[in-house]
């Protein structure tokens, strides 16, 4: 069983992710990473379709990266030790 840190749960909730105590942190992190990769591909498609100038791409990628700060946390640190 896993006890997720409250701050990690808040960040996951921003992306609609609600792991239960039986969900492995590695699985959760992999899922978040796949969401991020999807968003990056979508953003790239938008710049190719000229929905916004190429000069804005880097700042939009940075803004997107900041929405996925939980990816900076190793999966093993998603949880707290049970007392």
Language-model features and meaning:
Residues 45-51:
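A short, exposed loop/beta-hairpin motif centered on an aromatic-Gly-Thr core
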Residues 32-40:
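Short amphipathic alpha-helical heptad-repeat segments
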Residues 67-75:
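Short arginine-rich
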Residues 1-31, 75-83:
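Long, non-catalytic architectural segments outside compact domain cores
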Residues 54-63:
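Short, charged, amphipathic alpha-helical segments
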């Amino acid at each position: 069983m896993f006890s997720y840190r409250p701050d990690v749960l808040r960040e996951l909730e921003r992306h609609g992710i609600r792991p239960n105590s039986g969900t492995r942190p590695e699985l959760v992190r992999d899922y978040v990473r796949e969401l991020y990769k999807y968003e990056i591909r979508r953003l790239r498609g938008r710049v190719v379709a000229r929905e916004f100038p190429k000069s804005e791409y880097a700042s939009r990628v940075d803004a997107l990266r900041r929405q996925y700060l939980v990816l900076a946390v190793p999966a093993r640190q998603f949880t707290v030790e049970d007392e």
